[in-house]
């Protein structure tokens, strides 16, 4: 986080054998870790991004299918609120995704960005797509989307900013076990 707090997304199973996604954090460089409440039940494979100073977004695979679940915490997971885009804005068939937050000073657009990748479909794992949101994840406009791979694949991906102009994505593609692309 911008204040130096280390944060990782988590998933765990409770006695009901239902998975839950949340976060764990350390304020002392990783010596001690804390975890509070889960964000949403029956979710896994989450990604966490700081969308404003002290505000974390958890973007989760929702095992109910159809779309991503998204929640916000302002207190390191003690309380969560459902984000307005949750279960609406990001179609998905139940798969892992990638999400990164890129600050205005770190990209050539000079705007705060959320960059997201997943199979952009509600059935199967194809149409691997990168999307950019300019409004904190509320909208993901078609003009800010890039279809990388129409073919069937495993669908997992990992995003990174290579430099101020280049997004890197490592993903399970239809033409190779793993493909690395710089955009």
Where are these regions (language model features)?
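Asp-box/BNR beta-propeller loop motif
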Residues: 24-35, 71-82, 87-89, 123, ...
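Recurrent small/Gly-Pro-centered beta-turn motifs in extracellular repeat architectures
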Residues: 10-12, 59-62, 117-122, 170-173
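Conserved small/polar residues in nucleotide/adenosyl-binding loops
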Residues: 181-183
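Aromatic- and glycine-enriched pocket-lining scaffold segments that form the walls
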Residues: 1-25, 29, 33
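Short, solvent-exposed loop/turn segments at conserved positions within beta-propeller repeat blades
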Residues: 14-19, 63-66, 122-126
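Conserved blade-ending motifs and adjacent loop-strand segments that build the rim/top face
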Residues: 88-94, 140-162
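Loop/turn-rich, solvent-exposed surfaces of beta-rich toroidal or solenoidal domains
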Residues: 89-136
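Entry beta-strands of beta-propeller and related beta-repeat scaffolds
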Residues: 3-8, 54-57, 108-116, 165-169
């Amino acid at each position: 986080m911008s204040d130096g707090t280390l944060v990782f997304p988590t998933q765990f199973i409770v006695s009901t054998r239902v998975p839950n996604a949340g976060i764990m954090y350390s304020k002392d460089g990783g010596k001690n870790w804390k975890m509070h409440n889960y964000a949403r039940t029956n979710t896994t494979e989450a990604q966490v991004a700081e969308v404003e100073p002290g505000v974390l977004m958890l973007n989760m695979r929702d095992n109910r299918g159809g779309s991503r679940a998204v929640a916000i915490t302002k207190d390191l997971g003690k309380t969560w609120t459902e984000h307005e885009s949750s279960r609406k804005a990001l179609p998905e068939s139940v798969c892992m995704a990638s999400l990164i937050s890129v600050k205005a000073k770190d990209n050539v657009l000079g705007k705060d960005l959320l960059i997201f990748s997943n199979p952009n479909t509600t059935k199967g794992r194809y149409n691997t797509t990168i999307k950019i949101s300019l409004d904190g994840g509320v909208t993901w406009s078609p003009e800010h989307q890039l279809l990388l791979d129409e073919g069937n694949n495993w669908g997992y991906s990992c995003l990174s900013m290579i430099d101020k102009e280049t997004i890197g994505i490592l993903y399970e593609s239809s033409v190779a076990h793993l493909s690395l692309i710089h955009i």
